[in-house]
């Protein structure tokens, strides 16, 4: 088996992005562009991956960690100069090396493997990945001779009129014989319009030495898209979204309107789940089978088990167990855990709380920093009062408890099993098992008081 290495070019400043964020760290469907590239490269099982970093180097290293080795390009002197920075890490290795830009998030491992195979079949020292561009402006052109052999690559600013009319472009991905690559790089000069050391000049150097230079034309130009500004970022995101959504539908998920459904890379969805329009699924989210996610819902970094109904609600870093349901217009905040067959109705919020099986929280309630047992009824307008202005406090509620509407549960407090909280109560003390707690002022009726009220003199109120 041929030894494979990879060099990822990630040193560009990305000035056209007009951003404080390092270009290759801009996200496409939830992951930085350079992560997409590295993930696909890793699928080809390279022996060594070297990422060339420059501006914002530490942020790239922090994100990718030990998945790659790194070489610093302190000055931006061109792609040839960038690749040369990996020399100390790779120059003595046999085999082949792929060079790919860190801002091409749509490239796939399948394309890389086809490039490797073509390179091997042609016995080439260098193979260029090319594509036919509808509009080649801005790309380096592939110049072939009369019998179709690659002669050179000409950068946009160095083209003449005839060369500029060529629509076969250089995608910026190459496969080289590793040792040949670094030998040739030392012969590259910066005698061009940009005053830079072009990696593309290696092609001409090898041709002059009589080496075989091949070009594999990929069938899908869209896959080669490089991202240099926010417009291209949105275009790449659109393509990636379509890939992701298509994969889920082929795996048995119903997307009512794929065009309006945003699902990030890494989200897992079981079969026979239905996703309505304008749903957003992000981060490390898993959704089971036979679920329903209603229009306008957002789920982030959460686990949704089987047979769950979510109606127009937001769920963040939470867990919903089998058979539960939520919404419309409710919010599970971080560390909320909803038990089996639990009902969380409309306009409710649950935060840092565990809700036991079969408990019902019907509407207009807040449950924060609490543990609730099983088979509880939480009435309308119940508030778990968890913050004293300085610190958060926890409330524990047992099982088989009835909490009447408009009650306040002031933590820290313990409410035992089989208890009843009367409507309108403000509970500040522990409630023992099988007790009923009433904590409100006694009602007073004042006879004939109506006549003393100002409205009594208004004819409309007579």
Curated annotation (Swiss-Prot):
Residue segments, region N-acetyltransferase: 252-462
Reaction it catalyzes: alpha-D-glucosamine 1-phosphate + acetyl-CoA = N-acetyl-alpha-D-glucosamine 1-phosphate + CoA + H(+); N-acetyl-alpha-D-glucosamine 1-phosphate + UTP + H(+) = UDP-N-acetyl-alpha-D-glucosamine + diphosphate
Positions with a binding annotation for UDP-N-acetyl-alpha-D-glucosamine: 9-12, 23, 73, 78-79, 101-103, 140, 155, 170, 228, 333, 351, 366, 377
GO cellular component terms listed in the entry, alphabetical order: cytoplasm; membrane
Residue ranges, annotated region (Linker): 231-251
Key word Cell membrane present: no
Binding site for acetyl-CoA: 386-387, 405, 423, 440
Record function comment: Catalyzes the last two sequential reactions in the de novo biosynthetic pathway for UDP-N-acetylglucosamine (UDP-GlcNAc). The C-terminal domain catalyzes the transfer of acetyl group from acetyl coenzyme A to glucosamine-1-phosphate (GlcN-1-P) to produce N-acetylglucosamine-1-phosphate (GlcNAc-1-P), which is converted into UDP-GlcNAc by the transfer of uridine 5-monophosphate (from uridine 5-triphosphate), a reaction catalyzed by the N-terminal domain.
Region feature Pyrophosphorylase, mapped onto this chain: 1-230
GO terms assigned for molecular function: glucosamine-1-phosphate N-acetyltransferase activity; magnesium ion binding; UDP-N-acetylglucosamine diphosphorylase activity
Family from the record: In the N-terminal section; belongs to the N-acetylglucosamine-1-phosphate uridyltransferase family. In the C-terminal section; belongs to the transferase hexapeptide repeat family.
Species lineage: Bacteria, Bacillati, Bacillota, Bacilli, Lactobacillales
Pfam families: Hexapep, NTP_transferase
Keyword annotations of the record: Acyltransferase, Cell shape, Cell wall biogenesis/degradation, Cytoplasm, Magnesium, Metal-binding, Multifunctional enzyme, Nucleotidyltransferase, Peptidoglycan synthesis, Repeat, Transferase
Pathway info: Nucleotide-sugar biosynthesis; UDP-N-acetyl-alpha-D-glucosamine biosynthesis; N-acetyl-alpha-D-glucosamine 1-phosphate from alpha-D-glucosamine 6-phosphate (route II): step 2/2; Nucleotide-sugar biosynthesis; UDP-N-acetyl-alpha-D-glucosamine biosynthesis; UDP-N-acetyl-alpha-D-glucosamine from N-acetyl-alpha-D-glucosamine 1-phosphate: step 1/1; Bacterial outer membrane biogenesis; LPS lipid A biosynthesis
Top EC class, one word: transferase
Co-factor note (free text): Binds 1 Mg(2+) ion per subunit.
Stored Gene3D superfamilies: Hexapeptide repeat proteins, Spore Coat Polysaccharide Biosynthesis Protein SpsA, Chain A
Main location: cytoplasm
Subcellular location(s) of the protein: Cytoplasm
Enzyme Commission code: 2.7.7.23, 2.3.1.157
Subunit comment: Homotrimer.
The protein's name: Bifunctional protein GlmU
Reported cofactor(s): Mg(2+)
Binding sites annotated in the UniProt record for Mg(2+): 103, 228
NCBIfam families: glmU, PRK14354.1
GO BP: cell morphogenesis; cell wall organization; lipid A biosynthetic process; peptidoglycan biosynthetic process; regulation of cell shape; UDP-N-acetylglucosamine biosynthetic process
Gene: glmU
